[in-house]
Regions:
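Canonical P-loop GTPase G-domain recognition
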Residues: 3-15, 146-193
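Helical mechanochemical/support elements of P-loop NTPase systems and associated helical scaffolds
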Residues: 48, 61, 88-92, 119-122, ...
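Structured catalytic cores of enzymes that bind and process phosphorylated ligands/cofactors
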Residues: 31-34, 40, 55, 63, ...
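Conserved nucleotide-sensing/catalytic segment adjacent to the nucleotide-binding pocket
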Residues: 67-106
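Conserved nucleotide-binding/hydrolysis micro-motifs of P-loop NTPases
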Residues: 58, 71, 78-81, 116-118, ...
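Conserved G1/Walker A P-loop phosphate-binding module
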Residues: 1-83, 193
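Conserved C-terminal guanine-recognition region of P-loop GTPase G domains, centered on the G4
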Residues: 97-168
Length: 193
């Protein structure tokens, strides 16, 4: 997909701030610091549209990115950041859950995992939650640039085995090398038709 004019739309802290209308939403979920913002920037061909940080847990609201007035990338707060207080974790968890339960325009959920590591307990909980939601989703093994290209398929197989994936699409991705994005676009384009 050729993206011409993506733009940041809004950071929402409540449902009443969500964009109105029926534009499809491609929702990104994943642990803090898994690379959701870098994923958005790479997919949209922009360097700093989504703000990135080396500090986990920076995204505390839901960020909507308007992609050519066709669909939204929706960046949910990261989960599993150990330095968040219990209260912050509960609040963040409820915020994510409320959005996933009540989002009427969700066309696809993308669960981003770090390809280098086994899915964590938090990743497993999120995967199970998404599975039970009956919403369409894919799993992406992000940061594929951090491993040898010859090991990518094996790491994807390991993630699939750990999660028990048999039918869900599971793809590698690298913001650094800007590779594998074409396969992700194929899935997204199918869902936003």
């Amino acid at each position: 997909m050729q993206v011409k004019n993506p733009k940041f739309e809004i950071s929402a802290v409540s449902k009443k701030q969500y964009p109105k209308g029926d534009r499809p939403e491609i929702v990104l979920v994943g642990k803090s610091n898994v690379g959701k913002s870098s994923f958005i920037n790479t997919m949209l061909g922009r360097k700093n549209l989504a703000r990135t940080s080396n500090t986990p847990g920076k995204t505390r609201q839901i960020n909507f990115y308007n992609v050519d007035d066709i669909f939204y990338f929706v960046d949910l707060p990261g989960y599993g950041y150990s330095k968040m207080s219990k209260e912050e974790k509960v609040t963040s968890g409820k915020f994510i859950e409320d959005y996933l339960q009540n989002g009427t325009n969700i066309s696809l959920i993308i669960l981003l995992l770090d390809i280098r590591h086994n899915p964590t307990a938090d990743d497993m909980l999120m995967y199970d939650y998404i599975l039970k939601s009956n919403l369409p989703f894919i799993v992406i093994g992000n940061k594929a640039d951090k491993i040898a290209i010859t090991k990518v398929d094996g790491e994807i197989d390991r993630i699939k085995k750990t999660l028990g994936i048999s039918y869900t699409t599971c793809l590698p991705f690298s913001s650094e090398r800007k590779i594998y994005g074409d396969k992700v676009w194929e899935v997204i384009e199918e869902k936003i038709k």
